[in-house]
């Protein structure tokens, strides 16, 4: 009986060790913005709870209560299942108590009404640059450029920098090559100018000979 118990215990232990452990959710890139869309940050999160923590740290919200909605349509993000079903680089909007999601068009209309009271200041174009990292190991990261014309038409473009270290290395190499080429050109130009000045000085007559010609010409006139 004792031998049977020992064997069954070893089998159970082996089965428990052979079971694969649940994989942790991978880090996903996303971005967060404020209700007025004036601030936009890029972060990496594993879950919805992790997103709340990093939003609080990134936007320095301390203990202020907030909730998250999708920036494109205002859908509330409340469950982990719905969060995991979203695509990468999704933009979340942070709303506080009393704030409501508004589409960009309504915000542009309010912006134009506010400008109507101040006709002396009209923004023709506004360009914002948002530099963020999708991977913490990236050297430069990603650049989001957003241009707004007359507060109505907006265009945004995401530039994902791949191989940033290689790009920087090539840029430094070309900068070094340009500086060397410029140095050689300046050195060659200075040598040419020096030779030109020396040749000009050789063609001019000496001052002593020019002075001696004056008394000779006077004697001939006498």
Curated annotation (Swiss-Prot):
Swiss-Prot/TrEMBL keywords: Activator, Apoptosis, Endoplasmic reticulum, Lipid droplet, Lipid transport, Nucleus, Transcription, Transcription regulation, Transport, Ubl conjugation
Cellular component, GO, one term: endoplasmic reticulum
Region (Required for liquid-liquid phase separation (LLPS)): 1-33
Listed InterPro entries: CIDE-N_dom
GO molecular function per UniProt: lipid transfer activity; molecular condensate scaffold activity; phosphatidic acid binding
UniProt xrefs under Pfam families: CIDE-N
Gene Ontology biological-process entries: execution phase of apoptosis; lipid droplet fusion; lipid droplet organization; lipid storage; negative regulation of lipid catabolic process; negative regulation of triglyceride metabolic process; regulation of apoptotic process
SMART domains (alphabetical): CAD
Compositionally biased intervals (Polar residues): 1-19
Domain CIDE-N intervals: 26-103
Cellular compartment(s): Lipid droplet; Endoplasmic reticulum; Nucleus
The keyword Amino-acid biosynthesis belongs to this UniProt entry's keyword annotation: no
Catalytic activity: a triacyl-sn-glycerol(in) = a triacyl-sn-glycerol(out)
Region (Disordered) location: 1-33, 203-222
Post-translational modification summary for this protein: Ubiquitinated and targeted to proteasomal degradation, resulting in a short half-life (about 15 minutes in 3T3-L1 cells). Protein stability depends on triaclyglycerol synthesis, fatty acid availability and lipid droplet formation.
Self-association state and partner proteins as the record states: Homodimer. Homooligomer; undergoes liquid-liquid phase separation (LLPS) via its N-terminus, facilitating lipid droplet fusion, occurs at the lipid droplet contact sites. Interacts with CIDEA. Interacts with PLIN1. Interacts with NFAT5; this interaction is direct and retains NFAT5 in the cytoplasm. Interacts with CEBPB. Interacts with isoform CLSTN3beta of CLSTN3; inhibiting the lipid transferase activity of CIDEC.
Annotated family: Belongs to the CIDE family.
Function: Lipid transferase specifically expressed in white adipose tissue, which promotes unilocular lipid droplet formation by mediating lipid droplet fusion. Lipid droplet fusion promotes their enlargement, restricting lipolysis and favoring lipid storage. Localizes on the lipid droplet surface, at focal contact sites between lipid droplets, and mediates atypical lipid droplet fusion by undergoing liquid-liquid phase separation (LLPS) and promoting directional net neutral lipid transfer from the smaller to larger lipid droplets.
Record note on domains: The CIDE-N domain is involved in homodimerization which is crucial for its function in promoting lipid exchange and transfer.
Protein name, entry field: Lipid transferase CIDEC
Organism for this UniProt entry: Bos taurus (Bovine)
